[in-house]
Amino acid sequence: MASTDPMTRRFAVACGVLSQYVKANSSQPSTAAPVAQGVSGLMAAAAAAAAAPVVQEPGCEVDGGGQQFTIFYAGKVVVIDRCTPAMAAELMRFASAAQGGGGAPEAPPALVDMPIARKASLKRFLAKRKATPASARSSYVVRAAAAEEEQPPAKKAKADVERREDWLALGSLGHMHSR
């Protein structure tokens, strides 16, 4: 593997050691299909481990041929069929030994620029909104004010009286319902 990430290298080493262990301890020759050259080392080791016969240690019970062992790593899923609990424990020991002490996993870098990105996005949105014509509501208000200004003074006074009468009518309706 040509990766520079230390976790990737450690995992690749663990998979290589696992592959060697399975090949060395298998009593039958491996029946694994040839692996394509484009497949990464992790997938090749997992394919070899899955195709290899199960190694049974003395004192270990096999319940129906073992279970599936699934490894999630770097966005890939590796499933090993017929994995006994003893083999799973051995795999875990190899993986922890290859990690070199099993230190705490590194926290992902904090996304410090996230609020800045939101602020910039909001500024762009407001700038676009300011560039568009006035909103529909404000245009109606402007039109209504312009219409009132165009009316002759006599009609304006009559409209004001009608508005006042509307309010008085509302009060009288309430008085009629209370009887």
UniProtKB/Swiss-Prot annotation:
GO biological process: regulation of defense response; regulation of jasmonic acid mediated signaling pathway; response to wounding
UniProt keyword annotation of Cytoplasm present: no
Domain Tify: 62-97
Motif position, Nuclear localization signal: 117-124
Post-translational modification comment from the UniProt entry: Ubiquitinated. Targeted for degradation by the SCF(COI1) E3 ubiquitin ligase-proteasome pathway during jasmonate signaling.
Function as written in the Swiss-Prot or TrEMBL entry: Repressor of jasmonate responses. Involved in tolerance to salt and dehydration stresses.
Protein name (record): Protein TIFY 11a
Species whose genome carries this gene: Oryza sativa subsp. indica (Rice)
Name of the gene encoding the protein in the UniProt record: TIFY11A
